[in-house]
Regions:
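Short internal beta-strands
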Residues: 48-55, 229-234, 385-389, 409-420
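Beta-strand->loop->alpha-helix junctions that form or flank phosphate-binding loops
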Residues: 53-54, 72-75, 110-114, 155-158, ...
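Glycine-centered, small-residue-biased loops immediately flanking beta-strands
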Residues: 228, 382, 462
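N-terminal leader/targeting and accessory segments in enzymes
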Residues: 1-115, 237, 307, 493, ...
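Nucleotide phosphate-binding/pyrophosphate-handling subdomain across enzymes
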Residues: 19-27, 35, 39-46, 187, ...
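C-terminal helical cap/extension that packs against the catalytic core
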Residues: 403-460
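Phosphate-binding loop of NTP-binding sites
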Residues: 17, 42-45, 65, 79-81, ...
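Short acidic low-complexity segments
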Residues: 70-82, 165, 446-454
Length: 499
């Protein structure tokens, strides 16, 4: 990735808005992405000259052009203005011609997170962080705020099912983001509200150790604006350790701590207490009580149209954020009842030969365990079959025992080769180490062949879950659409049809 002038732990080099000239140009590489397109509109609304490029003719480019933003298809060095601040994502590498040109010209290069923080300093920025649960929790917050008329802006990693998008520019004061810890970019934000769903060591290829990973979350809490709110999950061991490490609040301007969960609350100012959970296929409800300084301020029932106790817990985090924003909790909790989920979170993609086919983004053992519980409820009297694509060699290596434990709960397991993403292979590490550790299941290296193997093992009434953060999603959709992958060419065509 191109060198970024500011480090991820120090924003001193990113100017305040009044210090950036009103005629400043910004150039966004990858402008068509959901999050980048919203950022482009934000910069444009602030009066800056905005242009950018994307490798493909994305649907968002038409909206950007209609707003008066210059957009190019394809990355070429001559398109980069010589006076621009260039904005990149972690997906932009040094061999990108526009990034290389910006570096050669000595232009400022900002990460998307830095630019988004710059644009949202006048908003109530709500940042949701955690090893898992970020997308669902941030989606719940954005969805409910929209339903009650707060007109929020948001930039989320997944697509909110009812809205068909994961990014939106609204006129309200709230801006909801999913803060990514995988590359440290969440340390670039200055939130008014931080929601931390859990702290379970992950992305050790970047952080190096569990201790460094946990320290990053301590550093994240230090990014909170004066007078802001920390919304912390009391049911997570890592968050409990964090709460002990965050300095005591003293004096005016210190952060408010809002604890949420089913168990014993953390010491803090506000407690969102969940109790009496009842779960069923595709639904769940529980009691909610909110106390501020020991005085009850709200009591009601939370009902969700999605299953799993982990989703009720995520909704508790959303309620904590809503309370921090001063939102009417009765309206907000009613709006949560209309939330139908985020894409790739136990998403029903179709039914074929009386086999229900679901898709889920789960890639860490803890979140997979929660997903499998919800999937088991949905399976009813049918069997639960899983086709899993491990994500990252390092995660697979470090968590092989945990993967084996959680997958012992399924009736039939197929594992394909690792989705490498940003990593180089680790000798001796692939999907087969999971089935070998488990002592059952089938390893099929090619993901299309693995998907077809899993489908052929299913019987009418079964539930087949495609699981993983990589490209396995294409397989589930394609099989649901009737593809059988008789050849590599057909597999490629099936994938193209889902793009």
């Amino acid at each position: 990735m191109p060198e970024i002038k500011d480090s991820s732990t120090n924003l001193s080099n990113v100017p305040q808005a009044h210090e950036v000239p009103p005629d400043q140009a910004f150039y966004l590489i990858g402008i068509g992405g959901a999050g980048m397109s919203v950022l482009a509109l934000l910069l444009h609304d602030l009066g800056y000259h905005v242009s950018g490029s994307d490798q493909v003719q994305a649907d968002t480019l038409g909206q950007l052009r209609a707003a008066g933003i210059t957009v190019f298809v394809g990355h070429r060095e001559e398109q980069v203005p010589t006076n621009a601040i260039v904005v990149v994502t972690s997906a932009v590498h040094e061999d990108n011609p526009e990034a290389a040109r910006a570096k050669a010209l000595g232009l400022e290069i900002w990460h998307r997170s830095q630019a988004l923080d710059f644009c949202t300093r006048s908003h109530d920025l709500v940042a949701v962080a955690g090893a898992h649960g970020k997308t669902s929790t941030s989606s719940m917050i954005a969805h409910a705020l929209l339903k009650i008329g707060a007109d929020p802006s948001f930039a989320i990693g997944g697509v909110i099912a009812e809205l068909g998008t994961g990014a939106r520019l609204g006129s309200g004061s709230a801006f909801v983001i999913e803060a990514d810890e995988s590359d440290g970019s969440f340390l670039n934000y200055s939130p008014a509200v931080e929601v931390i769903t859990n702290i379970e060591p992950d992305h050790l290829d970047h952080w190096g150790s569990a201790e460094a990973f946990e320290q990053a979350f301590v550093d994240f809490t230090a990014r909170l604006r004066e007078g802001g709110a920390l919304v912390l999950c009391a049911d997570d061991a890592g968050v409990k350790r964090l709460a002990q490490r965050v300095p005591e609040r003293r004096g005016v301007g210190g952060p408010r701590v809002i604890s949420y969960g089913f168990g014993v609350p953390l010491a803090g100012d506000v407690v969102v207490q969940l109790s009496e959970p009842e779960l069923g296929p595709g639904r769940g409800h529980c009691q909610v009580s909110v106390a501020d300084a020991g005085q009850q301020v709200f009591h009601g029932q939370l009902e969700l149209r999605i299953g799993g106790q982990h989703m009720l817990l995520n909704a508790g985090g959303a309620l904590g954020a809503a309370y921090a924003l001063g939102v009417d909790l009765a309206q907000f909790i009613a709006a949560l009842g209309t939330f139908s989920g985020a894409s790739r979170r136990m998403q029903l993609v179709g039914e074929r030969d009386h086999v229900r086919i679901y898709d889920d983004y789960g890639h860490h053992p803890t979140e997979i365990a929660a997903t499998l519980k919800a999937a088991r409820d949905l399976a009813g009297s049918g069997r639960l079959l899983v086709c899993f694509q491990p994500h990252l060699y390092s995660r697979t290596y470090h968590n092989v025992a945990a993967f084996a434990r959680v997958f012992a709960a399924v009736d039939d397991l197929t594992v394909c080769s690792v989705y490498a993403a940003r990593e180089a292979p680790i000798p001796g590490v692939n999907g087969n180490i999971i089935t070998e550790r488990l002592g059952q299941g089938t390893y099929v290296a090619d993901m299309y062949a693995a998907g077809l193997h899993a489908f052929r093992a299913a019987r009418p009434g079964d539930l087949l879950l495609f699981l993983g953060a990589g490209s396995i999603t294409h397989v589930g959709h394609a099989i649901a659409a009737g593809h059988d992958f008789a050849s590599v060419e057909q597999a490629d065509q099936a994938k193209a049809s889902q793009a």
